[in-house]
Amino acid sequence: MKTLAWTTLAVTVLLLISGGAAVAPAPVEAQGKPVVWNLPHVAAPSYYHIVNLNAFAAKVKEKSNGRMEIRVHAASSLYPAPELIPAVVDGRAEIAPVLSAYLTDILLELGVLELPFMTSTLEEHRKAAEQLRPFFTEQMAKKGLKLMTIHTWPSQQIFSHQPIRTLADWKGKKLRVYGAESADIVRTLGGAPVNIPFGEVYTALDKKVVDGAMTSATNAEPMKFFEVSKHINYWYLTGASLEWLAVNGKAWDALPKDLQQVVTDSLKDVRFEDKEWEDAKLWEERARKRAQELGMTMVDPAKEEIAKARDISRKAWQSWLKRTGADGKRGLELAQKALGR
């Protein structure tokens, strides 16, 4: 009882001294605990995004002498794909990729380079992305995000049960898409878009919920899509599919200045951006050969068919411009200028 009385008295005195205000806990670092950030992702653990992110996380821990830890959560294990952007915007995740595959009206303007047939190669895509960096930075800042890097997934193709060789073959096909722009592409070319999170694509193909799925050919082996589809159709709908590494602004501001520098320097030390683009090219080249070894058939539509698809797809551009307004129009002008058009 005496112990309880003394404890009560001590708390009362403390409250009187502080004017009745609650005493704030000591900062995390003052308590001797490392700063922990969570980084969710959709890619499989063996995919190059996760390999490179793990290298970055290891470098942060090394350079901070254990004062900071970034935990990488692969394969949608922390949040499903559609939740990645909301999670980093509202601070549930301190750092996360903003995938062009899952842009919504929150950041739809970022997807200008993902418009159908805007680019046809990784090199073109990167050239334009570099020129658009200030635009991307500005758009993210409006949502309280700090842009750290611009990197990419390889070009987007179509996995399917039956070959899609001609524009006519698109008609009525139920195809998995991953956002507004990809849905517009499929709809414009005559297909029926079905939004399916990345982690559910295998099951959708296996159960034939869809006739095919739009994604990178590099997913054939790590996601085992070769088990549930027979063809990869090389329409080169986009030269790449951008991904931006973003930090929640409040989380960044709460980080001590020296740890901010550690994060920035670690990305440079592991050559994160360059490595991502290099790996995208390497994996794309390797995927085509490997998919054939796994029993898949590569379908290369005639140039005339791709030209027809490119012409028709301009309707999707107009739909995107209506949704993105003045910022979208400015982004498109910047992209076309960067590509010399």
Regions found by a protein language model. Name each.
Residues E29-E124, L132-R341:
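N-terminal secretory/targeting leader peptides
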Residues M1-V36, R341:
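Short, low-complexity disordered leader/linker segments with a strong preference
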